[in-house]
């Protein structure tokens, strides 16, 4: 059955000697099943393909390429595609510079790129492979000694979820920030440790955990809380992928460094 939108993340059964094709705006994923072998090919799209889609095609339609990868797994049948967040922090460059005045709070909805993960199901379930779906650039965040390697991309700051267009290759992160200081909080770069976030699936959008940041000033600890329940912006959300590095409760030390760097203090 052909699928579009976030339905491309439904479990699938790939028949023997057939190919499954997931097509995203900037990348297509091909998976062929032959006996206990899984053949996988990831190709960049020459142009934006628009909405995501999934379908089963004949082997004769698979692209000729030397880049096919081959995996062995004795279980067969149902495969689980999953959206997962990148393996490094993401530095986001907003489309405009904003300043949060002292004593004020705001919420933004940020669109984070997701990766494609394919796993087998059954008793011997295993991860087969992961692949980025967007073009990300490597960037260094922080000073030369204590900084870290990140993924970088430009983004738009949404004030309401209604302005976010549904997309199967992006997850929405609600970020609430309180400026509990007497200092202006300037937004020039936003660094998010996405490896601490899970992904949930709603009826319209993919979501991450909500983040709640309390800024105390450039020389004081800043608090960041990861809300582990699904965000309350859609009904009947279900978890689809866990955080790579789960974090619990309020995070003081790491949060201060993140906010200190991304606001250029």
Features from the language model and the residues they span:
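Interface-prone segments of viral and bacterial extracellular assemblies
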Residues: 1-265
């Amino acid at each position: 059955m052909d699928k579009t939108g976030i339905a491309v993340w439904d479990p699938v059964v790939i028949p023997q000697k057939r190919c499954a094709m997931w097509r995203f705006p900037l990348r297509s994923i091909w998976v062929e099943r032959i006996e206990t072998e899984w053949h996988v090919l990831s190709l960049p799209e020459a142009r934006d393909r628009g909405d995501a889609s999934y379908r089963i095609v004949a082997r004769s339609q698979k692209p000729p390429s030397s880049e096919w990868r081959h995996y062995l797994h004795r279980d067969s049948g149902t495969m689980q595609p999953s959206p997962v967040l990148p393996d490094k922090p993401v530095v986001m460059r907003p489309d405009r510079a904003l300043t949060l005045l002292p004593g004020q709070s705001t919420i933004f909805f940020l669109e984070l790129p997701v990766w494609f993960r394919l796993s087998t199901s059954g008793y011997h379930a295993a991860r087969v492979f992961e692949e980025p779906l967007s073009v990300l650039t490597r960037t260094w965040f922080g000073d030369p000694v204590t900084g870290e390697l990140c993924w970088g991309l430009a983004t738009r700051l949404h004030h309401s979820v209604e302005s976010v267009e549904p997309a199967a290759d992006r997850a929405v992160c609600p970020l609430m920030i309180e400026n509990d200081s007497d200092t202006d909080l300037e937004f020039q770069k936003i660094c998010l440790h996405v490896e601490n976030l899970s992904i949930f699936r709603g009826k319209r959008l993919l979501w991450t955990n909500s983040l709640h940041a309390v800024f105390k000033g450039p020389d004081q600890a800043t608090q960041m809380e990861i809300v582990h329940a699904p965000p309350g912006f859609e009904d009947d959300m279900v978890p689809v992928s866990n955080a790579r590095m789960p974090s619990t409760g309020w995070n003081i030390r790491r949060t201060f460094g993140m906010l200190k760097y991304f606001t250029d203090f």
